[in-house]
Regions:
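A transmembrane-helix-recognition feature enriched in membrane-embedded lipid enzymes
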Residues: 1-63, 117-118
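Catalytic core of membrane glycerolipid acyltransferases/transacylases, capturing the structured
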Residues: 21, 25-29, 33, 40-43, ...
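Short gly/ser/thr-rich secondary-structure transition/capping motifs
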Residues: 58-65, 136, 197
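Short acidic-hydrophobic, aromatic-tinged amphipathic segments that line or gate anion-handling sites
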Residues: 64, 125-128, 222
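Residue-level preference for the first positions of well-ordered beta-strands
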Residues: 75-77, 150-156, 186
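A cross-family acyltransferase "interaction/gating" segment
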Residues: 114-116, 154, 163-228
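Soluble extracytoplasmic domains of inner/organellar membrane proteins
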Residues: 135, 142-143, 158-163
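A cross-taxonomic marker for long C-terminal extensions/tails that follow the last structured domain
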Residues: 224-242
Length: 242
């Protein structure tokens, strides 16, 4: 039934999703040119509010849970599992007051309405996976911006999306690089549940009626912890919560 209804409602979802990303491309441009980065960020937040709401057109339920008061006056590294591209709009919207940035493939900075503009000018890191020196340099620049502005970054240490929802081993690289420049960053694990089911049939049809959730897990400090311990604590916490 999820697949059958998906055939009916997926075109409606894509129509509205596409409308909003096209609408907000010139809005982002105007906000950035006239109001600078802060105005641009507000336009991106609003875009992702609308994108998240297009999920409801497929009968989805979306929940975000955070029982922990997170600081806004220091950098945060959100460490999350990754199940689909649909993970990202809710993260941008629900974490908006923490100025969450992302590490993205440089190829995405061209040709995608709204998305490419935000990746270019939103303050994240755009890396060439074939050029490790460029990738490290970009992440270090991001870490410097985090430290200077008390921004946060969302890291997907699995390195790729999980097609079946099962957790893949965590890699150290991105988190270790950020901590070199922002050693005072707080580590905050996030568990994402069931967004993989949304795309279990591929891009078409999307699955109807899935219950997706994003939950903040217990934060912890990096002091007196090795990188292996930091990643192990995060991986185990997310694994238990899945």
């Amino acid at each position: 039934m999820n697949k059958f209804l998906g055939y009916i409602f997926t075109p409606i979802h894509y129509l509205f999703f596409g409308f909003f990303v096209c609408l907000f491309h010139p809005i982002q441009w105007l906000c950035f040119k006239l109001g600078g980065q802060e105005a641009h960020k507000k336009s991106v937040d609003l875009l992702n509010f609308f994108l998240v709401n297009t999920y409801y057109l497929l009968g989805s339920s979306i929940s975000f849970k955070n029982l922990y008061p997170l600081p806004e006056n220091r950098p945060i590294i959100f460490i999350s599992n990754h199940q689909s591209l649909y993970d990202i709009p809710p993260l941008i919207w629900f974490l908006r007051k923490y100025h969450a940035k992302f590490i993205s493939k440089i190829e995405l900075t061209k040709g995608i309405p709204s998305v490419s503009f935000n990746l270019k000018y939103g303050g994240g890191a755009n890396i060439d996976r074939k050029d490790s020196k460029q990738a490290v340099a970009e992440i270090l620049k991001l870490a410097e911006r985090m430290k200077a502005n008390n921004w946060s970054t969302v890291i997907f240490p699995e390195g790729t999306r999980s097609r079946d929802g099962k957790l893949k081993p965590f890699a150290i690289g991105g988190v270790a690089t950020i901590l070199k420049k922002a050693p005072n960053a707080l580590i905050v694990p996030i568990v994402i549940r069931n967004s993989w089911k949304f795309v279990q049939f591929g891009a078409f049809p999307l699955s109807f009626g899935e219950r997706m959730s994003w939950e903040i897990l217990e934060p912890f400090e990096t002091e007196d912890k090795s990188m292996e311990e930091i990643m192990s604590i995060s991986e185990e916490a997310i694994g238990r919560a899945l």
